[in-house]
Amino acid sequence: MAFEVSAEDQDRQLTLIDEDGNEELFEVLFTFHSDDNDKSYILLYPAAVEDDDEIEVQAFSYDADEDGDVTSSDLHEITSDAEWDMVQGVLNTFLEDDRLSGDDSAE
């Protein structure tokens, strides 16, 4: 499985609107491209999360514009189990690799 995690995603935010019309601000955890699926993916978490809160990560495939920008209308739900498994594997790798997740406490 080939993927590339972008380190430039820190400090990027996206507003999502739920089925009730409520807006929620999300931070970009990271993005990556899967050569196997020929799709790009974005993983988000709520911006209003305290340090000790459990974080629920949202994952979507997306189509960026020609400048590489992404809006909520560019996001697509992941519907296949195989895609979910792949995204979960990438997330697990990200969380286990201190160099990617920015966790310096292991040093």
UniProtKB/Swiss-Prot annotation:
Transmembrane segments: none annotated. Coiled coil: none annotated. InterPro entries: EF_Hand_1_Ca_BS, UPF0473. Belongs to the UPF0473 family. This is UPF0473 protein Ldb1604.
